Amino acid sequence: MKEILFRIDDIGASTKHFNQHGKKWFYIRGKKVFYFPFANLWFFKKIWPFKKWAMYDELTLSEWKEIMSVFKAHHIVPIIAVTASWVEADSSMTPFPEKFPEEASFLKEAFLNNDIVIANHGLTHCVVGKHMPLFFGSNRAFHREFLPSLDESIHRAHILKSQEILEAFFEKPIEILVPPGNLWSEKTYRALKGTHVKKIMCSTYMADSDKPMDDIEFIPDGEGVLAFHDRELKLYGKEWLIDKMKEFNLK
């Protein structure tokens, strides 16, 4: 059986609080049965059954210990995609190790012991200043950090700063980039020049180019990669992870 790569995204990202959008269509057995046009209005996108994403909290130390016990029992070394800074409501940024010191220290020890691999999941996960929830409408489009429309200097600054924060804290080279929201650009690729990044992992290739990369490997999500968010683990616990492993005949 082919080895399965497990990857957890959105660690340390404030998108889990501020990426608020609603569910308009409801399905039964794959068929649309109900449409609610006000799902993105005010409080509706924060309540069941209209809430589609935020809000949920960061994983706690005790939750991480349970999750890692499952991975270790199955001899799996997961990829943990960390966003280097938490963007606050006022657009200020708090580095991951300062915002979540217990979680960060636990992950650092696991990384240094080769129990996990830390990947770069951006500096902010969002367009800073446009990340806050709207009274009406979805802000999901702005919870993508490496938009092709952004100036190349922004791509470069975010790559360099995120690498600086993560490598300084984890004390090892960070060699994988997981673009937030599976969106990245040729500008992002050029911004990686001179860093330790050797691989890009996500579901889609560059949004604005199909040029091959000379020095970086692209690993698409799909067969052989189980990518998910910390949201699933926060909401459904380690049992969700165990069930996923059973789907891959990992007992």
Describe the function of each predicted region.
Residues 1-176, 183-226, 233-251:
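Catalytic alpha-helical scaffold of carbohydrate-active enzymes acting on polysaccharides/glycoconjugates
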